[in-house]
Amino acid sequence: MNSYQPKSLLNELQYYITPPHGCSYLDNKSARMVFLDPVHRIDVVTLSELSRMGFRRSGDFVYRPECHLCRQCLSSRVPVQLFKMNSKQKKAWKRNQDLQLKISRPQDATDVHYALYERYINERHADGDMYPPSRDQFEKFLIHSCTDSFFLELWKDDRLISVSTCDPLDDGLSAVYTFFDPDENRRSLGVFAILKQIEHAKNLDLQYIYLGYWVPHSNKMNYKSDYIPLELLLDGQWRRLNRALTAEEIAQLGDSLMTTLPSGWNSPIIK
């Protein structure tokens, strides 16, 4: 009997590229995106292959930056079986042991989920391109999906305080977006949400958590480099960062990526 092998749809998909537009991460820079035709629903096998090639999902769109003279959007992933918490992460873990984890489907989201999302955007991202929030935006961004996404929810008794949207992959989980109660600053919920996703991937015996793009010249994205070891898709290959970079090293890496040429960045700390 022949064993069933899942078939990738990679070669059957139609790709498009956007015109230049303002970069969401770097001031005074333009960006372009390659994206899949959103009319096609893709399976886990295909999304997994695309993730290993540096693609991300947002709502029904699966995309990858394709920018002129800039390659700073580095896809990042954490090898969860090797991950070790730093002191800050250990404190966040200990501080949130009173929370309960629940798993749900985005399609089952209620007014409670939207109210938390609305407060989060209003109070944490009022200067971003997702402000002002709306129900339509919430549904297109987090409820609509071209794959079988799920929510990892954190509850304090009967109060929802954090939601992480995840995509299942054949080698891990893709961390799509997290929103949480902005009044719970002491808890470091953003940190704890990533730690819970790492734990969930470990429990499923998966290899990676895909954290999305790390942009060295964007301070708001530098938190991703706190999760060590961290693998970066650099010059077409996944390379491992085994310790946290200094601010100077981050700046040097960012400078080397302001070109379409291979970075040639051969620091021994990235293997």
Predicted feature descriptions by range:
Residues 51, 122, 202:
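Short polybasic/polar patches that bind polyanions
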Residues 117, 194-197, 224:
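Residue-level preference for non-acidic, small/hydrophobic
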Residues 173, 177, 181-187, 204-217:
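Nucleic-acid nuclease catalytic cores
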Residues 186-198:
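Conserved acetyl-CoA-binding loop-helix of GNAT-fold acetyltransferases
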Residues 195-207:
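Conserved acyl-CoA
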